[in-house]
């Protein structure tokens, strides 16, 4: 993009600007050249779309010619834009021409003469072959290049071989696993024997020597291999090289071989640990390292967009080191191994763990016998199908899952169902091109020849896929020994002089092996610095019970060749994990609307009651009910009812940024509504209890109720709430929190899980604040119930509606005491919690308004008591007699006056009694006592008429009523 910006002024300049130029040039750049036929041009730094959008390229810009298929550029491969607007070497055209194989231009132990063309060999070129002395040509001596093909097979030079009876034997010690974890020896041993026959029949390779094989069955067991290694080393004849098969056996053999100066060449070992040259200094293998699978696996993960994988491995060094390498590679690619399981012999528990962890993309690393155990457990756990993809090793037998295995209890049909659709990555072990190898056989001819040699079907033969590697291993050894020995007649060492103390011959064999490069039946054979084979990777998929090739990957060039023949059970590659969709549980809108309508009607009712109370505040009956407190009750009910609206608001209506404000609105509206509504009723009942009860014991408390005390009490309750809420909001404000529930699996989509979430208003110390709030509110409710019960029999006109207040307190307290804990328990059920809380608010508000205000409305309407106090005093006597309030007031006044007179009379009586007692004592001192008269006491005088103010009990009792 930066390059395009820099070149934009050049590209946008009109073609005719800048003076006279040649038709294909401009002073500011060069015109784009058309690519040659069967070829193209590589524009460095530009994409294909960018190239289509421009016509000129800047000065000093270079283009490169490339050709398709088996063609090469003839002429300049690179051209550069000159300052004069022309390209370099325009007098020489660049063409893409078909070439013949370059392998015909060299001949081992001979010379090639090219006529009729230059290198590379073009159509019409001719080559003549000549062998060196002591060699003779096998095949045609001339070949002609025509349409990219040579007219005859490539010949080779054979040495004039020593007679067979005079050739010296060179022994190879081999360990073939005929059974065990990988029974690769079943096919690899016949392949090795084929290679020995072919090598020994050649006159140009080891003409003075004959390779012979001494072998044992290692059973892919290091313990068994140790026994046979001892026999190979300590029994004659001397072996010049060792050839193990399994990685576990190769690890043992290769680590010990250096002590006997032996080269180790393996045909079936893939353990990455064997690439350690310090630990295994003399080790080579024609089987590529298992780490060669990992770049292919990572490439496929990226192709299908997988970012999370799981692994299960058999606990052996080869698989552990392979998995360690895979972990490093996926980490570099931004892919995560979420779950890693291993097992020694029983994979049941690891497979269950994979199922429990919802693993989807699973890489399995284990031998063939363990693979059957794993997939039997996979079938039992249903860990297969369109949700899962398994990546396995590709060197199992093609029908490995159909082979009878007494260690598992799954049928062939069950195993076939479990393995369907899995992917294998396999080293290309058979040359896909039908070209002739150094043995003068094509790969197809090799397969046919080996199949005839085997005693059973190739699919039932272990190691059949690795057989080409074993065949090429013998050829690599033969060529290295041939180079070490001098190739017959030339200077070299005597192989028969080798012994376990002769490091010189070992070093020469090592150098010869390290420089190996030839075409084998498995492809081009070459070893890297660690002694491992370099090769392509074949990607296959099990489709309908048989493996189908779906691609190749060349890790050295990062080139993925895809055939687009992959098939998926679900129609497409599955997701690497269950897609978790977070969904919020919102309040039922029908419930919210219904309760909102009830709340709105309640607010209207509160406004009507408030208006009624204010309008009739001059009426004595309304005045005696403390109308201002009733007004506060109506306002409190309105605020509480208004709290229903923010209580039902959630993410369905508002954004997350507005949620804290809604939380505060809920808290303040409900808190202040309760304080005003319930606080004013509590104040009434408190003062009724304080002033108008226990009058016999505390008559001095019978005072006139002062209104300011009522308002002060309400103010104290509201102030406590305001202070508490303010501190709460400042110190630990409410905010939006998310409650997450268990995942839900929808039936219609297998790769999606629903993660329900619920929004809450909460704070860090939510439980502490609720404890404080509910604590003193609960005490007020309980105290209100107690006071309402204590004052139920009190009759007073100062607060004439205290019984209605008590009834309202009962209802509010019961609803609140039940609803508060229930809503806390049901907080995770948004509909139930909202229904309980909102309906409790609505019902308590409705009950309070109806109980307090409806009787007053009914009384004023039915009795017509709409007069004020001034109007009431101007009424006639009949009206006065009908006014119970006035009579009550007059009787109370008279009662107080009579009580004062009675107290004075009682004091006078007490004083007279004291005087009488004093006189009696004085008389008794002057005259002796005389017997009392039968009547006793003082002489009775005429009875006095009862005084109007005498302390008659019935009268006093009447006054106290």
UniProtKB/Swiss-Prot annotation:
Phaclofen binds at residues 247, 270, 287, 466. 4-aminobutanoate binds at residues 247, 270, 287, 367, 466. It comes from the Eukaryota. The keyword Magnesium does not apply. Residues 867-892, 909-961 are annotated as: Disordered. Residues 30-96, 98-159 form the Sushi domain. It comes from Homo sapiens. Highly expressed in brain. Weakly expressed in heart, small intestine and uterus. Isoform 1A: Mainly expressed in granular cell and molecular layer. Isoform 1B: Mainly expressed in Purkinje cells. Isoform 1E: Predominantly expressed in peripheral tissues as kidney, lung, trachea, colon, small intestine, stomach, bone marrow, thymus and mammary gland. Alpha-helical parts of the C-terminal intracellular region mediate heterodimeric interaction with GABBR2. The linker region between the transmembrane domain 3 (TM3) and the transmembrane domain 4 (TM4) probably plays a role in the specificity for G-protein coupling. One of its GO terms (molecular function) is G protein-coupled neurotransmitter receptor activity involved in regulation of presynaptic membrane potential. The modification Phosphothreonine is found at residues 873, 930. Changing residue 182 to A: Abolishes signaling via G-proteins. Abolishes antagonist binding. Residues 613-631, 689-710, 790-804, 855-961 are cytoplasmic. Residues 869-925 form a coiled coil. InterPro entries: ANF_lig-bd_rcpt, GPCR3_GABA-B, GPCR_3_C, GPCR_3_GABA_rcpt_B1, Peripla_BP_I, Sushi/SCR/CCP_sf, Sushi_SCR_CCP_dom. This is Gamma-aminobutyric acid type B receptor subunit 1. The gene is GABBR1. Changing residue 367 to A: Strongly reduces signaling via G-proteins. No effect on antagonist binding. Heterodimer of GABBR1 and GABBR2. Homodimers may form, but are inactive. Isoform 1E (without C-terminal intracellular domain) is unable to dimerize via a coiled-coil interaction with GABBR2. Interacts (via C-terminus) with ATF4 (via leucine zipper domain). Interacts with JAKMIP1.
């Amino acid at each position: 993009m930066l390059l395009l910006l820099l070149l934009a002024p050049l590209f946008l300049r009109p073609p005719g600007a800048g003076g006279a130029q040649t038709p294909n040039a401009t002073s500011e750049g060069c015109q784009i050249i058309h690519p040659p036929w069967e070829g193209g041009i590589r524009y460095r730094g530009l994409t294909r779309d960018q190239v289509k959008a421009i016509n000129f390229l800047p000065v000093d810009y270079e283009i490169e010619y490339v050709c398709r298929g088996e063609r090469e550029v003839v002429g300049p491969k690179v051209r550069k834009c000159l300052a004069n607007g022309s390209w370099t070497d325009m007098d020489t055209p660049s063409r893409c021409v078909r070439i013949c194989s370059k392998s015909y231009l060299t001949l081992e132990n001979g010379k090639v003469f090219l006529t009729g063309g230059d290198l590379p060999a073009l159509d019409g070129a001719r080559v003549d072959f000549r062998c060196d002395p002591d060699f003779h040509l096998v095949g045609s001596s001339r070949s002609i290049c025509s349409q990219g093909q040579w007219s005859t097979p490539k010949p080779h030079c054979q040495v004039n071989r020593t007679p067979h009876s005079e050739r010296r034997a060179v022994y190879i010690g081999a360990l073939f696993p005929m059974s065990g974890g990988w029974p690769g020896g079943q096919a690899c041993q016949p392949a090795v024997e084929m290679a020995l026959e072919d090598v020994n029949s050649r006159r140009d390779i080891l003409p003075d020597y004959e390779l012979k094989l001494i072998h044992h069955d290692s059973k892919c067991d290091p313990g068994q291999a140790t026994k046979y290694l001892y026999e190979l080393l300590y029994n004659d004849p001397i072996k010049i090289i060792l050839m193990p098969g399994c990685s576990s056996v190769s690890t043992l053999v290769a680590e010990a071989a250096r002590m006997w100066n032996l080269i180790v060449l393996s045909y079936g070992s893939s353990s990455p640990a064997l690439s350690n040259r310090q630990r295994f200094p003399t080790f080579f293998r024609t089987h590529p390292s298992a780490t060669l699978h990992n770049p292919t696996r990572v490439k496929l993960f990226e192709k299908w967009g997988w970012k999370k994988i799981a692994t299960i491995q058999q606990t052996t060094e080869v698989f552990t080191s392979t998995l360690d390498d895979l972990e490093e590679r996926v980490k570099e690619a931004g892919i995560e191994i979420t779950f890693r399981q291993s097992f020694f012999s029983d994979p049941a528990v690891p497979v269950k763990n994979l199922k429990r962890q919802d693993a989807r993309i699973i890489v399995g690393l284990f031998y063939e016998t363990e693979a059957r155990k794993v997939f039997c457990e996979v079938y039992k756990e249903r860990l297969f199908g369109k949700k899962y993809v398994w990546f396995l090793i590709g060197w199992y037998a093609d029908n490995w899952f159909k082979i009878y295995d007494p260690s598992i209890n799954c049928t062939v049909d069950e195993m076939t169902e479990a393995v369907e659709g899995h992917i294998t990555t396999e080293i290309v072990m058979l040359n896909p091109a039908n070209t002739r190898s150094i043995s003068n056989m094509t790969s197809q001819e090799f397969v046919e020849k080996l199949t005839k040699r085997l005693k059973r079907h190739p699919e039932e033969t272990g190691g059949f896929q690795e057989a080409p590697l074993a065949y090429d291993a013998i050829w690599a050894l033969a060529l290295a020994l041939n180079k070490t020995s001098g190739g017959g007649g030339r200077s070299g060492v005597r192989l028969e002089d080798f012994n376990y103390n002769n490091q010189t011959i070992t070093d020469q064999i090592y150098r010869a092996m390290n420089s190996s490069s030839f075409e084998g039946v498995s492809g081009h054979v070459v070893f890297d610095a660690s002694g491992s084979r370099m090769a392509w990777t074949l990607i296959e998929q099990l489709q309908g019970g048989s493996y189908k090739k779906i691609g190749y990957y060349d890790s050295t060039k990062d080139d993925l060749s895809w055939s687009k023949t992959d098939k998926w059970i679900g129609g497409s590659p599955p997701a690497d994990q269950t897609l978790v969709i977070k969904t919020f549980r919102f309040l039922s809108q029908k419930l919210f609307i219904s309760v909102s309508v009830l709340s709105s009607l309640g607010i209207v009712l509160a406004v009507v009651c408030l208006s009624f109370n204010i309008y009739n505040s001059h009426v004595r009956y309304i005045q005696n009910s403390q109308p201002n407190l009733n007004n506060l009750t109506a306002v409190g009910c309105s605020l509480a009812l208004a709290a229903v609206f923010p209580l039902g608001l959630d993410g369905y209506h508002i954004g997350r940024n507005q949620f804290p404000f809604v939380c505060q609105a809920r808290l303040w509206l409900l808190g202040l509504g309760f304080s005003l509504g319930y606080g004013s009723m509590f104040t009434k009942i408190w003062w009724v209890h304080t002033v108008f009860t226990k009058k016999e014991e505390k008559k001095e408390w019978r005072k006139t109720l002062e209104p300011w005390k009522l308002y002060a009490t309400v103010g104290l309750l509201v102030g406590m709430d305001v202070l508490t809420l303010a501190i709460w909001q400042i110190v630990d404000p409410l905010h939006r929190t998310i409650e997450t529930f268990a995942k839900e699996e929808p039936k219609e989509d297998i790769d999606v899980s629903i993660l329900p979430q619920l929004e809450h208003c909460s704070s860090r110390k939510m439980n502490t604040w609720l404890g404080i709030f509910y604590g003193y509110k609960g005490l007020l409710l309980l105290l209100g119930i107690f006071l309402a019960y204590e004052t139920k029999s009190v009759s007073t006109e100062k607060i004439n509606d205290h019984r209605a207040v008590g009834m309202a307190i009962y209802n509010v307290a019961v609803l609140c005491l039940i609803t508060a804990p229930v809503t806390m328990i049901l907080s995770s059920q948004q509909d139930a919690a909202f229904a309980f809380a909102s309906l409790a608010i609505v019902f308590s508000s409705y009950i309070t308004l109806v109980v307090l205000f409806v009787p007053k409305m009914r009384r004023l309407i039915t009795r017509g008591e709409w007069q004020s106090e001034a109007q009431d005093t101007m009424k006639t006597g009949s009206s006065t007699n009908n006014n119970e309030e006035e009579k009550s007031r007059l009787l109370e006044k008279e009662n107080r006056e009579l009580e004062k007179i009675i107290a004075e009379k009682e004091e006078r009586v007490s004083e007279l009694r004291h005087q009488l007692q004093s006189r009696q004592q004085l008389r008794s001192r002057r005259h002796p006592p005389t017997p009392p008269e039968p009547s006793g006491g003082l002489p009775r005088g005429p009875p006095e008429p009862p005084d109007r103010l005498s302390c008659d009990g019935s009268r006093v009792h009447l006054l106290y009523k």
